[in-house]
Curated annotation (Swiss-Prot):
It is an enzyme of class 3 (hydrolase). Disulfide bonds: none annotated. It holds the Pfam family CN_hydrolase. The lineage of its organism: Eukaryota, Fungi, Dikarya, Ascomycota, Pezizomycotina. Belongs to the carbon-nitrogen hydrolase superfamily. Nitrilase family. This is Nitrilase. The keyword Transferase does not apply. Its EC number is 3.5.5.1.
């Protein structure tokens, strides 16, 4: 009889404050955090959404005209994939021997994208994807990902690693396609999102809270029978003015973090206070996913593809096509 072999992996979820609108400072902080997880022997680490150069809450709290100088600064402090800054991060990943999923605001030519790169232990970018649909007013500042960004899972020595950004987790079909890609460990990259004080009530939507976002991530762990690393930003009160949130009623003090690690049954493995910076660690057995799948496999034995199926277009759209040379 063949006994199952444990597949032990040490995972890490970042909860940290960005270096707001500071590309070099953000790169330095990522490198420092990679050093921390390397010392702790982490095999896989996830970072929050647009950790470089931070999530610009001012897009919600200021008019586009009032916010224009801030976003011009934001553009120039966003990170290009093909850049010396990214190569510094890749070198740090290699030095610390961890597989990294990094969330960042990507600058490409004249546009921005909400992006993730998957960097292996050799420091190579093995996948680069963009948020397929920026949320609400985000669409005024960031472009959309194309069909190639539907791929959100890559292989690694530590299992199959996946990742999505923020409200991509609300997209049932996108989640389903990730499950079909056989994800083992999923990085849920989120910005800073505060919970709603009782005194505010319905004046602030519950669906834009850390609590709701955490629940979405937990559902993905259960639904996809995978480990989920919830990685979030925090914002200190001293940075409220820079981010134009000082007068937002429900934002009360340093906080906005909700990092967590969930197991493939949806069970919480590790959590952290919302106002603290830190790194969550857990030693997990990737085979726990297979034990959970005995009960639930929504792309396998617990599916009905003869009744319900998903059509996927993974081909990237291009703004320019070249005609073939005419025959002479």
């Amino acid at each position: 009889m063949t006994a199952p072999v444990e597949r032990r992996v040490r995972v890490a979820a970042i909860q940290a404050e960005p270096v707001w609108n500071d590309l070099q400072g953000g790169v330095n902080k990522v490198i420092s955090l990679l050093g921390d997880v390397g010392k702790e022997g982490a095999n896989v680490v996830g970072f929050p959404e647009v950790f470089i150069p931070g999530y610009p809450w001012s897009i919600f709290t200021a008019t586009p005209l009032d916010n224009a100088p801030f976003m011009e600064e934001y553009f120039h402090n966003s990170l290009a994939v093909d850049s010396d800054e990214m190569r510094r991060i890749q070198a740090a990943v290699k030095e610390n021997g961890t597989f990294c999923v990094l969330g960042f605001s990507e600058r490409y030519q004249g546009s921005l994208y909400i992006s993730q790169v998957f960097i292996n232990t050799d420091g190579q970018i093995v996948h680069h994807r963009r948020k397929t649909k920026p949320t609400h007013v985000e669409r005024a500042y960031w472009g959309t990902g194309e069909g190639d960004s539907l791929k959100c899972v890559v292989d690694s020595p530590f299992g199959r690693i996946g990742g999505l950004n923020c409200w991509e987790h609300t997209q049932p079909l996108l989640r389903y396609y990730e499950y079909q890609q056989d994800v083992d460990i999923h990085v849920a990259s989120w910005p800073v999102l505060w919970d709603r004080p009782e005194s505010v009530g319905s004046r602030w939507p519950y669906f834009i809270t850390g609590d709701m976002s955490s629940r979405l991530s937990q559902v993905m762990a259960f639904e996809g029978t995978c480990f989920v690393l919830v990685c979030t930003q925090v914002m200190s009160e001293e940075n409220f003015d820079k981010n134009k949130v000082r007068d937002v009623e429900h934002i009360q003090g340093t906080g906005g973090g909700f990092s967590a690690i969930f197991g493939p049954g949806g069970e919480p493995i590790a959590t952290m206070p919302s106002d603290k910076e830190g790194i969550l660690y857990a030693n997990v057995d990737v085979n726990d996913k297979l034990r959970a799948k005995q009960w639930l496999d929504v792309v396998g034995h617990y599916s009905r593809p003869d009744l319900l199926s998903l059509r996927v277009n993974t081909h990237p759209s291009k703004p320019v096509f070249f005609a073939e040379e005419p025959e002479k």
